[in-house]
């Protein structure tokens, strides 16, 4: 999964499609504080879901060429996510519910989750709270230390 503001979404689609199979682009309603745009208020960001093969995990069920069972995709499983509220008391950049929804769709408890651009640890906090193991990398030392503290305290 790659989270992206709309300005960079096309670039990520091009990069991902060179090495991965893009399964879907999720558009979610980003209810962050008002932007400084002089035109339309932007409330949408993209999440790119790509896999290395056509065989992957979705909603705790395998999907792919050698699977018999097809996962039940209900009305709630749309690629338009408008149901994730922004909690103003959270310390992170993204709502925790966003990561929780992704983790529940694509992993089991005790699975490892890798975030090579962990920032201040939003994905690590969600992993810890949902029973996943986490590995994160960050080049900014201040962000790394803040992220480690947030994950430890969650």
Regions found by a protein language model. Name each.
Residues 148-154:
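Short, conserved SAM-binding/catalytic segment
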Residues 1-146:
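Core catalytic lobe of class I
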């Amino acid at each position: 999964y790659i989270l992206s503001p709309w300005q960079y979404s096309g670039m990520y689609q091009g990069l991902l499609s060179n090495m991965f199979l893009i399964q879907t682009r999720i558009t979610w309603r980003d209810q962050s504080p008002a932007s400084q745009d002089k035109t339309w208020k932007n409330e949408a960001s993209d999440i790119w879901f790509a896999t290395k093969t056509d065989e992957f995990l979705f909603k705790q069920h395998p999907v792919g060429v050698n699977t018999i069972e097809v996962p039940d995709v209900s009305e709630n499983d749309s690629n338009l996510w408008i149901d994730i509220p922004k909690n103003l008391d959270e310390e992170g950049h993204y709502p925790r519910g966003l990561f929780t929804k992704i983790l529940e769709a694509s992993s089991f408890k005790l699975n490892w989750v890798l975030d090579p651009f962990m920032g201040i640890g939003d994905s690590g906090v969600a992993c810890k709270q949902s029973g996943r193991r986490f590995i994160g990398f960050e080049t900014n030392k201040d962000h790394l230390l803040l992220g480690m503290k947030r994950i430890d305290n969650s």
